[in-house]
């Protein structure tokens, strides 16, 4: 068995004295593990850093085997991903999100989105908005997609201001007004019009929105917690936009 694909390094684990088991996100074959011989060598260590884009060739006798990777560098961005808190936490948080998906399950759109985000992690405003959209895409691929295109009550596609915590569907300002204190806010930049830039308040609301549904549909049923890197990324992104911003929590205790 053999195949070749584009990949992004998510992490490595030591295996024996000189080798590592690399975890990568491939474009056509999803999240995949493989042994990299001499992966701890001086030549390979810089290549196998999280966030780097590589080309991998995977070989194994049978498809269900771990197999071995041959890895060639394409874009070595890991060094600059260590420059900002949003980048450091963002790489870790996105890796954790991808681990919620089944191994070897292809999600090419998530691979493409991951590459875009990695190239924008130095800009907190762009990185925050892209990260929220990445979380929405992961929720959708897990079967818990939100419907933000029209009002659940009236079918209206304008002035959407809330999201129902029960249905995950958008609600217009007028229809949701009587229950506004029980609704989640829908940030304008996530609306169908899509012509609003994310500011610190709308970004905080967006993090709270995705955090709520990840907790409800994924973390709580699986008995796991969101990785600390998500909170680190959220706070770094908000602080970069507004140094006076504080940690925000939803009423149920889920961090923004």
Curated annotation (Swiss-Prot):
NCBIfam families: reco. One of its GO terms (cellular component) is bacterial nucleoid. HAMAP family: RecO. The keyword Transcription regulation does not apply. PANTHER family: DNA REPAIR PROTEIN RECO. Involved in DNA repair and RecF pathway recombination. Gene3D superfamilies: Nucleic acid-binding proteins (2.40.50.140), Recombination protein O, C-terminal domain (1.20.1440.120). Belongs to the RecO family. InterPro entries: ARFGAP/RecO (IPR037278), DNA_rep/recomb_RecO_N (IPR022572), NA-bd_OB-fold (IPR012340), RecO (IPR003717), RecO_C (IPR042242). It holds the Pfam family RecO_N. This is DNA repair protein RecO. The keyword DNA damage applies. GO terms for biological process: DNA recombination; double-strand break repair. Keywords: DNA damage, DNA recombination, DNA repair.
């Amino acid at each position: 068995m053999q195949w070749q694909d584009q990949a992004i390094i998510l992490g490595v684990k030591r295996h024996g004295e000189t080798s590592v088991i690399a975890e990568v996100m491939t474009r056509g074959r999803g999240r995949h593990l493989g042994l990299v011989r001499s992966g701890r060598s001086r030549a390979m260590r810089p290549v196998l850093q999280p966030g780097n884009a590589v080309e991998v060739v995977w070989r194994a006798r049978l498809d269900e085997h771990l197999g071995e990777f041959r890895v060639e560098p394409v874009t070595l961005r890991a060094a600059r991903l260590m420059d900002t808190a949003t980048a450091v936490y963002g790489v870790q948080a996105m890796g954790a999100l991808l681990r919620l998906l089944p191994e070897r399950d292809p999600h090419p759109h998530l691979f493409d989105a991951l590459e875009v985000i990695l190239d924008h992690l130095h800009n907190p405003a762009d990185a925050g908005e892209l990260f929220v959209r990445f979380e929405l895409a992961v929720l959708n691929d897990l079967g818990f997609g939100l419907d933000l295109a029209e009002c659940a009550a009236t079918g209206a596609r304008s002035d959407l201001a809330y999201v129902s915590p029960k249905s995950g569907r958008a609600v217009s300002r007028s229809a949701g007004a009587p229950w506004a204190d029980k609704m989640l806010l829908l940030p304008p930049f996530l609306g169908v019009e899509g012509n609003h830039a994310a500011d610190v308040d709308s970004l905080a609301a967006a993090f709270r929105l995705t955090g709520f549904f990840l907790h409800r549909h994924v973390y709580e049923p699986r008995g796991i917690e969101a990785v600390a890197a998500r909170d680190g990324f959220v706070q770094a992104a908000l602080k970069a936009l507004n140094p006076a911003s504080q940690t925000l929590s939803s009423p149920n205790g889920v961090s923004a």
